[in-house]
């Protein structure tokens, strides 16, 4: 899947991730089922203060680009915090991260968990595919069809691991 940043979607987080503006996809919401992530605890998931926690998926651990994305994201984060000289940051950003376009913000609306051991995607989705039409079949879970709930539905982090109870996918709508 392409690199992405995840936040809970609180206004303070949306404001801050807009300043970070890297990587190119910002996903707001959970869809997570196995325990709480650090960003879901107080003080981060709390409207009464300005503290923000973000989670970044930079890529596969073994992929050479993953380290580059991680460093570029950290540099953009420091730039947004205004704690490091901008020249220091610009001198260290990779060429593709120096002038990123406006990151796309998406809301996580659904989390799909396999009910059976017979869950299969209709295509070998890798993540960030946008399915144009509502009602498009994207998977089969036993005898149940899994359909997109709205037009322009983004598929976030499809999981091809087998097993009932496994989170298979998050569905997202443009913010």
For each predicted feature, which ranges?
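Structured catalytic-domain cores with a bias toward divalent-metal coordination
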Residues: 1-175
